[in-house]
Amino acid sequence: MKPIIAIVGRPNVGKSTLFNRLVGRRKAMVDDMPGVTRDRNYAEVNRFDVPFILVDTGGFEPETSDRLLQQMREQSRFAMDEADLILFVMDARGGLTPADRDVVDMLRRINKPVFYIINKVDGEKQEAEAGDFYSLGVDHIHTISAEHNRGVGDLMDEVLAAIPYDREKESDEEITRIAVVGRPNVGKSTLVNRLLGYERVVANPTAGTTRDAVDTRFTVNKKPYLLIDTAGIRRKGKTVQKVEKYSVMDALRSIERADVVLIVLNAEEGVTEQDSKIAGYAYEAGRGCIFVVNKWDTLAKDNSSIAKFTEEIRRNFKYLPFAPILFVSAETGQRTGKIIAEVDQVMEQYCKRVTTGELNRVFTQAVDENHAPLSAGRRVKFYFATQVAVKPPSFVVFTNCPEGIHFSYERYIMNRFREAFGFNGTPLKLIFRGRDKKDA
């Protein structure tokens, strides 16, 4: 396993700026609003051929009555428990605070390497003003400017020398990447916490509580998964604040990174236009899809309730007839145990390969039973089909008229492939191509 490095500290001391500096891309949101990174945010980093997992956290306030800040504090404690090494960040401009002293006292009791860092030291003036921090009595303090990359290289040289890493045990394991998407406050974070078995993501009744797309590795029956709890995707008109805009883009990027997308719907509100747009993002990205109807326990139901809601989903998501539907309650855990099993089945289909012989047997039979319509008065001829890719399964069909295939006939061929080979939960790509002489 890769070693884990956690970045902790009070709100707005520059943790996310340091995180982004080390990751090399803008992964955590950076804004002047305290508490902008509310959850733990993970990234895999490889620095000078030493791989590790870097964890950014929300601000750590030892004493607070604010419920959200209390939750962020608990997330920071979880991160410190998981970590092999801790980077504790303080703010040179804000000076040494009682909260900093409280955290240092707590870190002294942790039997792990801790690096004490004063951030926002942009020059000699700030270096001189940082003298108060040496009263903490720790062995060594590093002064850096994460924003201007001052002192970061020297810091990381020492960090890399201190982290435990056994290259012999490290392997590039296959991992299933799961994105959890949906409108704000449909219960995504509660669902993630239920799947993981502990409070990994801040769950709060306030819509938009999860701002960053947060990655978590976990295993079920020794099988590895990466779970991405995306920020809620709002309608464009509601994406007003700069931070909210970042979150929507982050959620869409999370779909791009995923293998399987859990599209979370709110049973209390039914299917909305925004749900359709979100599902459309996943479909257009070519990802495996599962509908998860959450808050099912809150509805008054009869024997036809599931059938009626299923019909509503199929009517509104006609482009996803292959996506399984699960009715769950993240709050109570009802049926959530079925989700990972369904993910495994969809992933199997998402990676499925069919031999050229099997494929052409089904394809030839389909064409014989239903000939393609004429194209500009020409008869459409098909030569053969072959699978060229997985994730999603993609096929090339060679024909004399690649531009003249009607979309309804394309859908017919894909339906015949599904009837023969399954492909439940995954989109298919079908490409019609003219036959070159070398293909003859």
Curated annotation (Swiss-Prot):
The keyword rRNA-binding does not apply. Residues 3-167, 176-351 form the EngA-type G domain. Coiled coil: none annotated. GTP 2 binds at residues 182-189, 229-233, 294-297. InterPro entries: G_ENGA, GTP-bd, GTPase_Der, KH_dom-like, KH_dom-like_a/b, P-loop_NTPase, Small_GTP-bd. PANTHER family: GTPASE DER. This is GTPase Der.
